[in-house]
Amino acid sequence: LKLPFKIRDYQFDAVCTGIQRKNAILLSPTGSGKSLIIYVLMRYLISSFEQDVLVIVPTTSLVEQMYNDFKTYGYDVEKYCHRIYSGKDKNTTKRIIISTWQSIYRFQPDWFSRFGTVFGDECHGFKSKSLTTIMNKCVEAEYRFGTTGTLDGALTHELVLQGLFG
């Protein structure tokens, strides 16, 4: 990957867990490099499979942050990544889509069929009906990962997340 820095052991362990399990909730504290974990997993999967990758984040600022993080890691984001949020084009042939959930939850199920991998950043927010609807439309996504720095501790919430991400 030619990263500009060394990946930490716990990040490497999270990536290995993701590859082995295919579905996982990756719990890691704020500031621990969750975007790097997403990036390394994404790069592995995009090079190993033909299906595209969807990265869902809660806000437009996080769309930009994730995009810029990938750029910082040395990725050609202009060539491979597309951002979707208010005012951005919803159609693209780029293989990696970074979007807010609000921008895509009303899309038809066939729009989601191209994705073999889905990342839900800040997945503790995925208990909402809109986010659950998105995940249920991603029927082709063999790989599903949720990342979060916190789980709220409610058993019902944890079971919903396990159902969506593994």
Q: Whereabouts are the PLM-identified features?
A:
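Conserved pre-motif I regulatory segment
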Residues: 1-27
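Hydrophobic positions in the central parallel beta-sheet of the AAA+
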Residues: 26, 55, 97-99, 110, ...
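The Walker A (P-loop) glycine that initiates the GxxxxGKT/S ATP-binding motif of P-loop NTPases
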Residues: 28, 122
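Conserved Walker A/P-loop ATP-binding site and its immediately adjacent core
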Residues: 32-72, 131, 153
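Structural beta-sheet core signal
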Residues: 55-56, 83, 146
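Conserved nucleotide-binding/hydrolysis micro-motifs of P-loop NTPases
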Residues: 60-62, 89, 103-105, 124-125, ...
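Inter-Walker segment of RecA-like/P-loop motor cores
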Residues: 71-109
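Post-DEXD/H (motif II) to motif III coupling segment of the RecA-like Helicase ATP-binding lobe
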Residues: 116-117, 124-166
